[in-house]
């Protein structure tokens, strides 16, 4: 867990005095970098009693073909380009907006796989 509250340090280097304890709603989590590989998902309870599916790895994507108007489940070969980070393409990290190479062509990821537990994409070639 990561605490996302205000720092105790002032810009001058001094300390702010503590007015209260840390609160549970100020906590966050480490980000999950979804990789290509055997499917691994973890169910995590979030605020309001809801759940998020953290996707650690997956080798299939639901790709929408706009010409045919159909969605096909295809195997992900690699990450071609990722605008989120320079080195994500090299490490095969899948995020929203990443361009992935699939068995039917290149596709752009349209969802947030690390928070939704599935990879959805739209065919671009």
UniProtKB/Swiss-Prot annotation:
Keywords: Ribonucleoprotein, Ribosomal protein. One of its GO terms (biological process) is translation. CDD domains: Ribosomal_S8e. InterPro entries: Ribosomal_eS8, Ribosomal_eS8_CS, Ribosomal_protein_eS8_arc, Ribosomal_Se8/biogenesis_NSA2. It comes from the Archaea. Pfam families: Ribosomal_S8e. GO terms for molecular function: structural constituent of ribosome. GO terms for cellular component: ribonucleoprotein complex; ribosome. PROSITE patterns: RIBOSOMAL_S8E. Residues 1-20 are annotated as: Disordered. Belongs to the eukaryotic ribosomal protein eS8 family. Part of the 30S ribosomal subunit. This is Small ribosomal subunit protein eS8.
